[in-house]
Amino acid sequence: MKAKAAVFMGAHKDFEVREFDVTECPAGYGQMELIASGICGTDIHFHNGTLVVGAPTVIGHEFVGRIIGLDEKEAEKYGLKKGDNVIADIAVPCGECILCKNGDDANCVNMQVTNGGSIDVAPYLYGGYAQVNYTPLSNLIKIPEDIDPVVAATFACPGPTTIHACSLAEKAGVNLSEINVAVVQGLGPVGTFAVMYLKRMGVKKVYAVTAGDNAKREELAVTLGADKVFNLTREGKDNITRALQAENGGLGVDLCFEASGAPQAVVQGMDILRNRGVYLIPGQYSASGGIEIQPQMITFKALHIIGSSQYSMKDVEAYLDFLGKNPELSPVIEKLGSKYKVEQINEAVADAKSGNNIKTLLVR
């Protein structure tokens, strides 16, 4: 049996579609056939050269598949069996560092990953851009039977990313249900999920700030819960800043969630927050350059700035729980993924970069 995979050849280079032997499942691993695998913004950063990963390799960390091979006795320890639909989580924290012991394993200082292994050593296919994937059983999260696996795949990384950032806010004493006004900067996959999540966590008013000409994203944000979408290109930064500073009787907004990845967004975020406002920043993930900020504003406004990177398996579980508790979202989410075969990888990456797709998925 053979399986195709899209091999990452390096920044700015075309992916190569290659065939690999489907080998026996190693001990401790699950063997999955592809249902859907997302192209993440992180993968785009790899291809653009703003984040570095070795090549050649099979990248991709948003793999959702159906288990076709495992050691059944060993799998019982994880509540898994053949035929289960699962999300493959790539993070392997050490469990021993101070962060892991404090429950912050998403930021383990010795973090390893399950994907990106050698394509020259069996079983070859550890990454998500493949028709078959091998992931340790300990890193597989079962998708409940009442959740469409393609729906689960659509926000398999953006969802846990958002939830983890919000959990850090909650850990710092922020009660989302008591937030009056929140602003989401950026309407990519993370920002889009953040809109629906914040609204359903009880935030009274959720605004989004975006740029460019993409009415589809703006309409979707409103459908998912945004009370209003501001567009920097049409309305101008200064006008939007003034409008948001007027919230809460002229105090500004309570919470800002940065998901644009644009460094200049941080300046506006600090400007629109009220005194003691909370700024969640999971979006600044690539080396996009520096900007000038006014540190005095952090002090005088007593801003609470919380960076967030990565997520843990418990955030993936919380994501699936969120989908299960909000089934009305599924009919909307299932329409958001633009689907491509693995053989169409270069077209898929180009379309993902264009911004025209809400979410780009590889399917079998």
What are these regions (language model features)?
Residues 94-185:
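NAD(P)H dinucleotide-binding glycine-rich loop of Rossmann-like/cofactor-binding domains
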